[in-house]
Amino acid sequence: SRDIGMTWLAAAIAHWVTFFHPGTVVGFGSRKEDLVDKNGDPDSIFWKIQAYIAGLPIEFRPKDQTRTHLCIVNNDNGSVIKGEAGDNIGRGGRSSLFFKDEALILSSKVLTSNGWVLMGDLTMNDKVIGIDGTEKDITHINDCGEFETYSVTFSDGTVVECSPNHLWTVNEVIGKRKTVTVRTNEMYERYKYTSPQGKILYRYRMPLIAPINFEKRELPLHPYVVGALIGDGGVSQVPKSSPKLTSIDEDLVDYFKSKLPDYCSFVREKEGISYRLNDVRGRMGWKHKSRIRQAVVDVGIAGKRSWEKFIPAAYKYSSIEDRLALLQGLMDTDGSAGKSGGSAAYYTSSKMLADDVRFLAESLGGYATMKIKKDKRGYRDQYVLFIILPAEFEPFILKRKLDIYKIRNNTIERSIICIEKT
């Protein structure tokens, strides 16, 4: 930490956790081993930990403690304080708590259980999403001050700005493939190389996040219904008139109908391919307020035209099952299956919706790249998303699209294609 005294505070937290919680493991990591543990050096982290423990009243010190290089074992309860450095950071097994010397800029977006939050706006009450797709508690927020920054660009267009010492656990694919933990400034010097054939290749690939386990939410309509309405639905006149679905695909229509609430009727317009969603007529006749129209309003897509559509937050941050059903509704209507392994495409004239669908795919452990097709005739531009999902998820319900779609079995990764000083 760059703050005076923060290492001492971290030492106190580490001792408190391991002293009062049997079997816990607390880790410390830094770029050089001597910064973590160097015999007799007051600047090293482990010297401070030992000095802190030695200054405590005897009842707060372990009765039986073993001290070795980069390791302090509390033999009374089996807890451990361990140290790691350089490429070995993150390789020492699981930790209950880990302190690392790294930083992102304050304007970086961090995914939490409630959506994206700027790094500078994070609080101790936020829960951030880890690479395993689960929520993680924030144990401390520290202002690292001013430092030189690097801009890291990935093959899907994602850009991250971070400090030179920010740690990355990546797959190095040159020679024998291996997983390494490196700092930004180390990758900067060697992230690309030239093949014997003269082709520029990229050394580092980043594993994708596991499907995110957001909590299931109470939703006004089934996610598949919402996805299909966003794709082929008419909602621009809701609540003045009823929503409708337009499709020539009978399989889609049948599946859509099966996911409608019991209070909703689904009637085909005369000699057409559109279907109106109305309330089932009950004792109150048609004088009561339309529940299906209100449901569309509650979802948040009422009154939206094609280029204004988006995915409401409640659906975007619901459970894995709900997000997959939503994506399937979108893909069955406005998506296509690619013939190459595990690829699919989604088309929309809404930039906001394109960004939301991209997030949806990535939140399921997938990968998405976006291209913009400019329209020379004066119409709106089209955003095309190329999507790859993990093997356990199928982006379609429709059989005719699934018959074309081929499951991708190999690992999905993003390459680091550019690192620049900013």
Which residues does each predicted region cover?
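A short beta-strand micro-motif
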Residues: 107-114, 128, 150-153, 385
